[in-house]
Regions:
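Alpha-helical oligomerization segments with coiled-coil/rod-like character
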Residues: 1-35
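A residue-level detector for short acidic-glycine micro-motifs
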Residues: 50, 70, 86, 116-119, ...
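Conserved, short, structured surface segments that act as functional micro-motifs
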Residues: 95-98, 126-171
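Glycine-aromatic-enriched surface loops/turns that form tight recognition elements
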Residues: 37, 41-43
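Zn2+-dependent peptidoglycan hydrolase active-site motif and core
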Residues: 61-63, 78-121, 145-152
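Short glycine/threonine/proline-enriched tight-turn/helix- or strand-capping micro-motif at secondary-structure
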Residues: 29-30, 47-81, 100-101, 158
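Short, well-structured beta-strand-loop connectors
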Residues: 75-84, 122-137
Protein backbone atom coordinates (compact mmCIF):
# COMPACT_ATOMS: atom_id res chain seq x y z
CA UNK A 1 0.00 0.00 0.00
CA UNK A 2 1.26 3.45 -0.83
CA UNK A 3 1.84 6.05 1.86
CA UNK A 4 -0.93 8.15 0.31
CA UNK A 5 -3.47 5.31 0.58
CA UNK A 6 -2.41 4.55 4.15
CA UNK A 7 -2.93 8.19 5.14
CA UNK A 8 -6.31 8.29 3.38
CA UNK A 9 -7.37 5.15 5.26
CA UNK A 10 -6.25 6.57 8.60
CA UNK A 11 -8.05 9.87 7.91
CA UNK A 12 -11.26 8.04 6.95
CA UNK A 13 -11.05 5.93 10.12
CA UNK A 14 -10.46 9.00 12.29
CA UNK A 15 -13.38 10.83 10.63
CA UNK A 16 -15.65 7.84 11.19
CA UNK A 17 -14.63 7.54 14.84
CA UNK A 18 -15.23 11.26 15.42
CA UNK A 19 -18.64 11.06 13.74
CA UNK A 20 -19.70 8.00 15.74
CA UNK A 21 -18.51 9.53 19.01
CA UNK A 22 -20.46 12.73 18.34
CA UNK A 23 -23.57 10.74 17.41
CA UNK A 24 -23.25 8.59 20.55
CA UNK A 25 -23.06 11.69 22.71
CA UNK A 26 -26.29 12.98 21.17
CA UNK A 27 -28.23 9.84 22.01
CA UNK A 28 -26.55 8.46 25.14
CA UNK A 29 -28.81 8.09 28.13
CA UNK A 30 -27.05 7.12 31.38
CA UNK A 31 -30.35 5.72 32.64
CA UNK A 32 -30.57 3.21 29.75
CA UNK A 33 -29.51 -0.18 31.10
CA UNK A 34 -27.61 -2.72 29.00
CA UNK A 35 -28.31 -6.27 30.20
CA UNK A 36 -25.47 -7.79 28.11
CA UNK A 37 -28.01 -10.39 26.91
CA UNK A 38 -27.00 -10.15 23.25
CA UNK A 39 -28.31 -12.21 20.33
CA UNK A 40 -26.79 -13.14 16.98
CA UNK A 41 -27.10 -10.33 14.38
CA UNK A 42 -27.82 -12.77 11.50
CA UNK A 43 -30.28 -15.66 11.05
CA UNK A 44 -27.24 -17.96 11.09
CA UNK A 45 -23.47 -17.59 10.87
CA UNK A 46 -21.66 -20.27 8.88
CA UNK A 47 -18.21 -18.88 9.48
CA UNK A 48 -16.20 -15.81 10.40
CA UNK A 49 -14.08 -14.62 7.47
CA UNK A 50 -12.02 -12.09 9.43
CA UNK A 51 -11.64 -12.00 13.20
CA UNK A 52 -11.13 -8.97 15.43
CA UNK A 53 -7.46 -7.99 15.55
CA UNK A 54 -6.36 -10.02 12.52
CA UNK A 55 -4.16 -8.06 10.11
CA UNK A 56 -6.30 -6.54 7.37
CA UNK A 57 -5.32 -7.92 3.96
CA UNK A 58 -5.50 -4.52 2.28
CA UNK A 59 -4.16 -2.06 4.86
CA UNK A 60 -2.24 -4.46 7.15
CA UNK A 61 -3.94 -2.92 10.18
CA UNK A 62 -5.65 -4.89 12.98
CA UNK A 63 -9.23 -5.66 11.95
CA UNK A 64 -11.70 -3.60 13.99
CA UNK A 65 -14.55 -6.11 14.14
CA UNK A 66 -15.71 -9.53 13.00
CA UNK A 67 -16.75 -10.21 9.41
CA UNK A 68 -19.64 -12.62 8.90
CA UNK A 69 -20.21 -13.66 5.27
CA UNK A 70 -23.86 -13.98 4.24
CA UNK A 71 -25.96 -13.79 1.11
CA UNK A 72 -26.84 -10.37 -0.24
CA UNK A 73 -30.01 -9.08 1.41
CA UNK A 74 -29.81 -11.33 4.48
CA UNK A 75 -31.63 -9.71 7.40
CA UNK A 76 -29.49 -8.01 10.05
CA UNK A 77 -30.90 -7.86 13.58
CA UNK A 78 -30.21 -5.56 16.51
CA UNK A 79 -28.23 -7.66 19.01
CA UNK A 80 -29.90 -5.90 21.95
CA UNK A 81 -32.30 -3.09 22.79
CA UNK A 82 -31.01 0.42 22.31
CA UNK A 83 -31.23 3.68 20.42
CA UNK A 84 -29.89 4.11 16.90
CA UNK A 85 -27.25 6.81 17.19
CA UNK A 86 -26.10 6.70 13.56
CA UNK A 87 -27.53 5.41 10.29
CA UNK A 88 -25.65 6.72 7.28
CA UNK A 89 -23.35 5.98 4.36
CA UNK A 90 -19.63 6.35 5.11
CA UNK A 91 -16.73 6.04 2.62
CA UNK A 92 -15.01 3.04 4.22
CA UNK A 93 -17.88 1.34 6.08
CA UNK A 94 -20.55 1.91 3.44
CA UNK A 95 -24.09 1.89 4.75
CA UNK A 96 -23.75 1.49 8.50
CA UNK A 97 -25.78 1.65 11.69
CA UNK A 98 -24.61 2.25 15.25
CA UNK A 99 -26.81 1.33 18.20
CA UNK A 100 -26.15 2.59 21.71
CA UNK A 101 -27.28 -0.10 24.15
CA UNK A 102 -26.75 1.77 27.39
CA UNK A 103 -24.71 1.13 30.49
CA UNK A 104 -24.21 -2.25 32.16
CA UNK A 105 -24.14 -2.83 35.91
CA UNK A 106 -20.35 -2.34 36.04
CA UNK A 107 -20.75 1.17 34.59
CA UNK A 108 -19.43 0.54 31.07
CA UNK A 109 -21.37 1.79 28.03
CA UNK A 110 -21.98 -0.54 25.08
CA UNK A 111 -22.57 0.20 21.39
CA UNK A 112 -22.62 -1.98 18.30
CA UNK A 113 -21.79 -1.00 14.74
CA UNK A 114 -23.08 -2.88 11.69
CA UNK A 115 -21.32 -2.04 8.41
CA UNK A 116 -21.30 -2.71 4.64
CA UNK A 117 -25.11 -3.06 4.58
CA UNK A 118 -26.89 -2.97 1.23
CA UNK A 119 -29.40 -0.74 3.01
CA UNK A 120 -30.67 0.06 6.48
CA UNK A 121 -34.25 0.46 7.67
CA UNK A 122 -33.75 2.49 10.85
CA UNK A 123 -32.91 6.12 11.53
CA UNK A 124 -30.98 8.04 14.17
CA UNK A 125 -32.97 8.50 17.35
CA UNK A 126 -35.11 5.42 16.77
CA UNK A 127 -35.50 2.91 19.61
CA UNK A 128 -34.91 -0.70 18.59
CA UNK A 129 -35.48 -3.94 20.43
CA UNK A 130 -33.40 -7.09 20.49
CA UNK A 131 -34.07 -8.97 17.25
CA UNK A 132 -35.55 -6.03 15.30
CA UNK A 133 -34.48 -5.91 11.65
CA UNK A 134 -32.18 -2.92 11.18
CA UNK A 135 -30.89 -3.58 7.66
CA UNK A 136 -29.64 -6.02 5.05
CA UNK A 137 -26.28 -7.62 4.28
CA UNK A 138 -24.39 -5.95 1.44
CA UNK A 139 -20.93 -5.03 0.25
CA UNK A 140 -21.02 -1.22 0.31
CA UNK A 141 -18.01 0.89 1.20
CA UNK A 142 -14.42 -0.30 1.02
CA UNK A 143 -14.73 -4.09 0.70
CA UNK A 144 -11.65 -5.50 -1.00
CA UNK A 145 -9.26 -8.38 -0.53
CA UNK A 146 -10.12 -11.08 2.02
CA UNK A 147 -12.82 -8.79 3.42
CA UNK A 148 -14.57 -8.43 0.06
CA UNK A 149 -17.90 -9.88 -0.92
CA UNK A 150 -21.21 -9.78 0.88
CA UNK A 151 -20.81 -9.77 4.65
CA UNK A 152 -21.71 -8.06 7.90
CA UNK A 153 -18.86 -6.22 9.59
CA UNK A 154 -19.81 -6.16 13.28
CA UNK A 155 -18.08 -4.03 15.90
CA UNK A 156 -18.63 -3.78 19.64
CA UNK A 157 -17.49 -0.64 21.42
CA UNK A 158 -17.21 -0.59 25.19
CA UNK A 159 -16.77 2.95 26.52
CA UNK A 160 -15.98 3.92 22.91
CA UNK A 161 -13.16 1.39 22.52
CA UNK A 162 -13.40 -1.34 19.90
CA UNK A 163 -13.57 -4.76 21.55
CA UNK A 164 -13.81 -8.28 20.14
CA UNK A 165 -17.56 -8.67 19.53
CA UNK A 166 -17.33 -12.46 19.53
CA UNK A 167 -16.45 -12.41 23.23
CA UNK A 168 -19.93 -11.02 23.97
CA UNK A 169 -22.22 -11.67 21.02
CA UNK A 170 -23.35 -15.20 20.01
CA UNK A 171 -22.43 -16.27 16.50
Amino acid sequence: MTEEKRKAYEQATAALDAYLKAQSQKYQDPARHCSLDFTCPLPSVGRISTYFGEPDAVYNKPHTGADMPAASGTLIYAVAEGVVSAASARPSYGNCVQIDHGTADAGSSYATLYAHMSSFCVSAGQTVHKGDVIGYVGNTGDVRGANGGYHLHLELRINGTRTDPLQYIPH
